[in-house]
């Protein structure tokens, strides 16, 4: 049951992190207008089960007035709200509180701040640390997101992962991470990746929405376009087994997706996301409606 929508307020970001799911950066296009924000939230409300709306990106604080108005509208509609940011704007404690106080006044439920070396170079006195301190002083609900460079850990001593390489660090191999972070990591035969380890494709609880109208079940994997079909109808009619990408993934993971469409591929991959992302990138021109936008795959 769908309970949350995450608006990718913009793909634009002040940073260009190697691990970014959606290939954000300073030149990235795709920003909501105010009218689109209102329409997306109205469509979410029509479903009847959506309880929360997050604003993220990219970097939503780059479009500060739009972000605040989106949060205000969502709160007035009864949604719990959250914001995800890298806190580039927290240049001092005073400035951090200045930026955050309007969110406190609007009553957001969560502020998630990226605090890691990808965003801030591992500095102790990073903008993220300043923002977290400021949020706590204001009494704003907050938490940090910390992703590390992928690295090899010893395999699990028992259970289904016994003897298999374990990749630590928290980075998920989608988006720019596939092109920047897989070098040197151990790989396994593609046939081993028989399930999607992260997303509930059969019954998604949250989706990401972008300004192009794409409704992401996973970054770059869309169930349709909300500017063409309303969300209430889309999810009323949704059957994952009939989706050309989700169907095979449910039947047998990325390995099944590869076998289903019989395209040329490598013999080994780091993990299921690595295989799935590259398989989807190969299938872009075949299923442009469901694999979008192209920029999430590092393409124009």
Question: What residue spans do the PLM features occupy?
Answer:
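Structured loop/turn residues at beta-strand edges in well-structured enzyme cores
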Residues: 48, 106, 271-274
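Residue-level signal for mature regions of secreted extracellular proteins and peptides
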Residues: 6, 10-13, 211, 266-269
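Secreted/processed peptides and extracellular or luminal domains of membrane proteins
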Residues: 19, 23-26, 224, 279-282
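Short catalytic/ligand-binding loop motif for oxyanion handling, primarily in non-cytosolic enzymes
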Residues: 27-28, 62-63, 90-92, 119-122, ...
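Short cysteine clusters
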Residues: 13, 17-20, 218, 273-276
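Radical SAM enzyme [4Fe-4S]-AdoMet core and its adjacent flexible, acidic
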Residues: 101-239
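Flexible mid-to-C-terminal extensions adjoining Fe-S/redox cofactors in radical SAM and related proteins
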Residues: 226-300
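Conserved alpha-helical substructure of the radical SAM core
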Residues: 1-79, 83-86, 90-98, 294, ...
């Amino acid at each position: 049951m769908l309970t949350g929508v995450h608006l990718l307020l913009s793909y634009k970001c002040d940073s260009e992190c190697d691990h970014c799911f959606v290939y954000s950066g300073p030149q990235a296009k795709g920003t909501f207008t105010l009218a689109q924000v209102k329409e997306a939230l109205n469509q979410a409300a029509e479903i009847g089960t959506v309880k929360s709306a997050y604003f993220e990106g990219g970097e939503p604080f780059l479009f500060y007035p739009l972000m605040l108005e989106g949060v205000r509208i969502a709160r007035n509609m009864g949604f719990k709200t959250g914001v995800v940011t890298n806190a580039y704007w927290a240049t001092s404690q005073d400035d951090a509180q200045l930026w955050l106080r309007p969110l406190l006044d609007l009553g957001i439920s969560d502020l998630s701040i990226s605090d890691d070396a990808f965003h801030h170079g591992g500095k102790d006195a990073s903008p993220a640390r300043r923002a977290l301190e400021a949020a706590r002083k204001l009494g704003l609900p907050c938490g940090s997101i910390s992703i590390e460079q992928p690295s090899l850990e010893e395999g699990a001593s028992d259970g289904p992962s016994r003897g298999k390489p374990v990749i630590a660090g928290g980075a998920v191999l989608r988006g720019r991470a596939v092109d920047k972070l897989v070098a040197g990591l151990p790989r396994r035969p593609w046939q081993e990746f028989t399930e999607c380890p992260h997303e509930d494709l059969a019954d998604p609880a949250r989706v990401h929405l972008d300004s192009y109208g794409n409704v992401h079940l996973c970054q770059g994997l869309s169930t349709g376009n909300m500017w063409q079909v309303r969300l209430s109808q889309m999810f009323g009619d949704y059957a994952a087994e009939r989706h050309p990408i989700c169907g095979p993934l449910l039947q047998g993971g990325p390995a099944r997706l590869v076998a289903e469409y019989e395209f040329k591929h490598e013999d080994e991959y780091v993990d299921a996301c690595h295989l799935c992302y590259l398989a989807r990138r190969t299938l872009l021109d075949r299923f442009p409606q469901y694999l979008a936008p192209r920029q999430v795959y590092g393409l124009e």
